[in-house]
Amino acid sequence: MTDAPLILLAAGGTGGHLFPAEALGVVLIRRGYRVRLVTDHRATRYSGLFTAEMTDVVPSETVRGRTPWALAKTALKLGSGALLAFNLIGRLKPAAVVGFGGYPTLPPLLAATWRRVPTLIHEQNAVMGRANRFLAPRVDAIATGFPGHEIAWPVLASKITNTGNPIRPAVADAATVAYDPPAAGGSLRVLVFGGSQGARVMADIVPPALEKLDPALLRRLVLTQQVRDEDMGRVRAVYDRLQLNCELAPFFTDLPQRLASSQLVVSRSGAGTVAELAAIGRPGILVPLPGALDQDQFANAGVLTAAGGALRIVQPDFTPDRLAAEITALAADPAKLTQMAAAARQIGRLDAAERLADVVGRVAKV
């Protein structure tokens, strides 16, 4: 196996970047490649395919300000990371380097281009992020999670392949579970989460929204909610007072299974979340993260909403009254929930990791 070609996967240290890298890694290993992960220190929070022996941490930095000092600090950190990555790539001699977005991918991808190692980036979002925009003219190929990038970037169109967003094996397994619409008067299983890092807005809005539900509907509710540690006390106090059937945790390691068992999902709209909702086929109420320069989550939610699989509510409109009204309307219309689930499933890409592995093979020429 030591003679097998090595593919270096570079990803920012959050679930949104690491999970598709993991999904690709599983397929590449099955095809006979070796894989290693290059990332930042945050990745240690996420267990999965990449053990410590398969992981290299390279210094990196996100642009956090526009002052000369802030920019100089960022440039220095990225420069030191690129030098370390240059030496790492010289030692490992990978057949290709694949980037999954985020500033931590800049050092290894730039180092790979300097070493003339074949390069590929994967853009998970419906709009291209800043790190990938910087790398796009410099790499050999671009894979995308959503269609339309070739229209937005015609000068790059010849490099672009729409593969879809790779999903983890656990998500593919969950996708075999058929949607089970709520029966009249029966339980309504609702899953609420805010992405791999949680979201305070769910703790702020969901509890007062549930307080506004009709008591008969509240008794039907079976709630699973991701709640950050710092929000747990106040959220649990409301639900205890409501005598709500609920399970709360800061992070769910079995989220794909929980998605599969849910009948309605309320969440942010990161690329991974949208891809998993579509793959498994579950109706969603999506609340894009506001304030992002690229408005990527707004665009991601728009893809699923346009297909009929979700409702998109921008955060200023995501009020307790609005959420209570949407839950009430959907709970009363199981046929609508079933239609949304089917529409979401229609645009799901279960073979995205295989398609991306095909592109990697073409770029690496091994």
From Swiss-Prot:
Residues involved in UDP-N-acetyl-alpha-D-glucosamine binding: T14, G15, G16, N125, R168, S196, Q297
Keyword Cell membrane listed: yes
Lipid bilayer topology: Peripheral membrane protein
GO molecular function: UDP-N-acetyl-D-glucosamine:N-acetylmuramoyl-L-alanyl-D-glutamyl-meso-2,6-diaminopimelyl-D-alanyl-D-alanine-diphosphoundecaprenol 4-beta-N-acetylglucosaminlytransferase activity; undecaprenyldiphospho-muramoylpentapeptide beta-N-acetylglucosaminyltransferase activity
Chief subcellular location: membrane
Reaction it catalyzes: di-trans,octa-cis-undecaprenyl diphospho-N-acetyl-alpha-D-muramoyl-L-alanyl-D-glutamyl-meso-2,6-diaminopimeloyl-D-alanyl-D-alanine + UDP-N-acetyl-alpha-D-glucosamine = di-trans,octa-cis-undecaprenyl diphospho-[N-acetyl-alpha-D-glucosaminyl-(1->4)]-N-acetyl-alpha-D-muramoyl-L-alanyl-D-glutamyl-meso-2,6-diaminopimeloyl-D-alanyl-D-alanine + UDP + H(+)
One Pfam family, short name: Glyco_tran_28_C
Protein family per UniProt: Belongs to the glycosyltransferase 28 family. MurG subfamily.
Protein's name in the database: UDP-N-acetylglucosamine--N-acetylmuramyl-(pentapeptide) pyrophosphoryl-undecaprenol N-acetylglucosamine transferase
Organism: Rhodopseudomonas palustris (strain ATCC BAA-98 / CGA009)
Taxonomic lineage from the root: Bacteria, Pseudomonadati, Pseudomonadota, Alphaproteobacteria, Hyphomicrobiales
Gene that this sequence comes from: murG
